[in-house]
């Protein structure tokens, strides 16, 4: 399968290759689809914002209408308020317990696989985030044999795609099976998907940090405000915005693999990711007035998260001095899913996600129930 990738992330971006954002036809399809979509899906779609990305010798340039359009700003403010209200109502309904979760030993592999598929198929960051959330919820309360973990993740991703993407982006069964080298039959996938939905209680409205990030970036002028103290002066603000967006994408890809962050409010995670990016770039203050207002947070609330995220970043860089070499496959709205390349492993570039499995194909059935295939 052909996929565009970057092999370096450096200050000059000279080797960057970034796929173009969805064109006008895609936008028209998305808007026309709203009329037929369930109400729960419309909320997720409203939080998205299209933009344009293209390759430059020095920068990853983009257009974010909300930065200068009062109407778009008002829309994003409404979206952010709605998301925060939903968070107040739903946060705490699921608590991740790493000691009780049955998949912790394999979670990083499953998360990396989900990120890689979403990057290769150009799915949005919310799709990846929701798929990971579904996987955690199912595997936290259900004993699943190791041989079925990959199948569970596959079905969680399929459900997330149906929930977050437009109908035209939902993969066919043939495509779905190709993600795992056709190791699972259509019948076993359908049965597992039903089992996953039952385990989730058909409650698919999961709110994740990715839902907040785009609105917060729009409401904070791309994370860099007019009153910010930046090292090189106002003339470099656009450059700082682009650097900040890059760092946000990479840092968030590390955060989704950290189980210690799973029980934090999604809005605070999103705010902390942006604040951490500001600290990393030397932008002061850490938490701008715009970010405080957008996320309804105080610096005191997110400082522990910022300190933790900076530690995550430092540890990742220490483990791999070639952290510049980041596997990047596509852009989604104004975020990009980043898949860090494992140290000493070329499996991502050589084989592709279609051949990456956690274990062998399940010899039995979903949740180890003895169902006979037709």
UniProtKB/Swiss-Prot annotation:
Transmembrane segments: none annotated. It comes from the Eukaryota. Keywords: Cell cycle, Cell division, Cyclin. It holds the Pfam family Cyclin_N. The keyword Cell division applies. InterPro entries: Cyclin, Cyclin-like_dom, Cyclin-like_sf, Cyclin_C-dom, Cyclin_N. GO terms for biological process: cell division. PANTHER family: CYCLINS. Belongs to the cyclin family. Cyclin D subfamily. This is Cyclin-D.
């Amino acid at each position: 399968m052909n996929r565009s990738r970057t092999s370096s992330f450096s200050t000059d971006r000279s080797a960057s290759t970034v796929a173009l954002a969805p064109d006008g036809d895609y936008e028209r399809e998305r808007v026309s689809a709203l009329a037929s979509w369930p109400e729960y899906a419309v909320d997720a779609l409203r939080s998205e914002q299209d933009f344009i990305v293209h390759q430059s010798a020095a920068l990853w340039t983009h257009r974010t209408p909300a930065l200068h359009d009062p109407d778009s700003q008002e829309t994003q403010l409404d979206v952010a308020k709605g998301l925060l209200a939903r968070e107040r109502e739903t946060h705490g309904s699921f608590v991740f317990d790493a000691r009780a979760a049955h998949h912790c030993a394999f979670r990083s592999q499953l998360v990396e696989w989900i990120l890689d598929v979403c990057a290769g198929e150009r799915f949005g960051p919310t799709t990846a985030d929701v798929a990971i959330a579904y996987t955690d919820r199912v595997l936290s309360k259900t004993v699943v044999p190791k041989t079925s973990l990959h199948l569970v993740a596959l079905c969680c991703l399929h459900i997330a795609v149906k929930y977050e993407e437009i109908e035209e982006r939902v993969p066919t069964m043939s495509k779905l099976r190709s993600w795992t080298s056709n190791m699972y039959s259509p019948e076993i996938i359908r049965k597992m998907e039903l089992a996953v939905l039952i385990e989730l209680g058909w409650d698919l409205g999961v709110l994740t940090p990715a839902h907040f990030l785009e609105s917060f970036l729009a409401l904070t002028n791309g994370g860099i405000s007019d009153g910010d103290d930046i090292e090189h002066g106002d003339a470099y603000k656009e450059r700082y915005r682009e650097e900040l967006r890059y760092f946000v994408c990479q840092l968030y890809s590390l955060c989704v693999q950290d189980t210690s962050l799973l029980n934090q409010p999604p809005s605070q995670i999103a705010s902390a990711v942006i604040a951490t990016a500001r600290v990393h770039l030397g932008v002061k203050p850490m938490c701008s007035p715009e970010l405080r207002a957008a996320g309804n947070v105080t610096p005191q609330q997110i400082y522990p998260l910022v300190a933790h995220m900076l530690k995550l970043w430092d540890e990742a860089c220490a483990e791999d001095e070639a952290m510049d070499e980041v596997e990047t496959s596509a852009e989604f709205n104004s975020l990009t899913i980043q898949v860090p390349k494992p140290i000493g492993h070329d499996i991502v570039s050589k084989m592709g996600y279609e051949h990456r499995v956690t274990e062998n194909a399940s010899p039995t059935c979903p949740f180890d129930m003895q169902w006979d295939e037709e």
